[in-house]
Amino acid sequence: MKQTVYIASPESQQIHVWNLNHEGALTLTQVVDVPGQVQPMVVSPDKRYLYVGVRPEFRVLAYRIAPDDGALTFAAESALPGSPTHISTDHQGQFVFVGSYNAGNVSVTRLEDGLPVGVVDVVEGLDGCHSANISPDNRTLWVPALKQDRICLFTVSEDGHLVAQDPAEVTTVEGAGPRHMVFHPNEQYAYCVNELNSSVDVWELKDPHGNIECVQTLDMMPENFSDTRWAADIHITPDGRHLYACDRTASLITVFSVSEDGSVLSKEGFQPTETQPRGFNVDHSGKYLIAAGQKSHHISVYEIVGEQGLLHEKGRYAVGQGPMWVVVNAH
């Protein structure tokens, strides 16, 4: 398995393309100059395209991915109704979902043969919309509205329209600020990192009565932490055994172990990392974690070690200015 790591740096308007080898070392293979401040990125389900959101002219760009080395070639673009904060796709590669924090909306862009061809739906009134996350069964779009302490739930119709479910939302504790999400591989649980109180919620997707319930909330910060809480990103290993979340003020990554059924998180430790870690990701083997420092302009690679999933630094690399997003593609 070959793996390519993409790093988006909006301040220098670049995507750095790296080869990740089996020992966790990175080799720079390409630097792409992007026509705008590039922020969120996602790889298409068939691994043929990288979709990126740019501003100040709000667009989604599609780059064709070379199957041999992961190199990028521009392929298409489509306008967006707000500044892109987060970008994702459905599992069949029919639609791109874009959450916009500033615009307070989530939009759906239709794909034709992998290329974006236009917005088919926009839902407004999502104050502080920070991500759009499709459930493993491709049926429910989870959309955190950070400033409203709620996660809105939509069914995606065949033509890409978003239909509010019943119930239409779940709520967090006041002042939590739900931000980004991941799902357990067993498709029974979701995990949401809350920006404003630096906590992680565990959501049971369906209990025996068909309800969605928060079954655990864990503080992700050290006990003696007294500064402003400012959590950012969350990821889980492919085997579902380890979960990680980062805080930008403390510049640390919190390490969690996950119970076998996915219902319980246990805090295992903390890893100091790059300054102001806005984004990170886990590779497809589950052996390595790559974190980007928005203020350090570097990335660090960590090996995931042992039953606790603790992080051991393997290497550090300079990238563009203000790196914010990390994506790993296996090919």
UniProtKB/Swiss-Prot annotation:
GO molecular function, one term: 6-phosphogluconolactonase activity
Homology family: Belongs to the cycloisomerase 2 family.
UniProt-recorded name of the protein: 6-phosphogluconolactonase
Keywords, alphabetical: Acetylation, Carbohydrate metabolism, Glucose metabolism, Hydrolase
Gene that produces this protein: pgl
The protein's role, per its UniProt record: Catalyzes the hydrolysis of 6-phosphogluconolactone to 6-phosphogluconate.
Top-rank taxon, per record: Bacteria
Pathway(s) served: Carbohydrate degradation; pentose phosphate pathway; D-ribulose 5-phosphate from D-glucose 6-phosphate (oxidative stage): step 2/3
EC number, UniProt record: 3.1.1.31
Catalytic activity: 6-phospho-D-glucono-1,5-lactone + H2O = 6-phospho-D-gluconate + H(+)
N6-acetyllysine modified-residue sites: K287
SUPFAM superfamilies, alphabetized: Nitrous oxide reductase, N-terminal domain
HAMAP family assigned to the protein according to its UniProt record, in alphabetical order: 6P_gluconolactonase (MF_01605)
Pfam family, one: Lactonase
Entry GO CC: cytosol
Alphabetical GO biological process terms: glucose metabolic process; pentose-phosphate shunt, oxidative branch
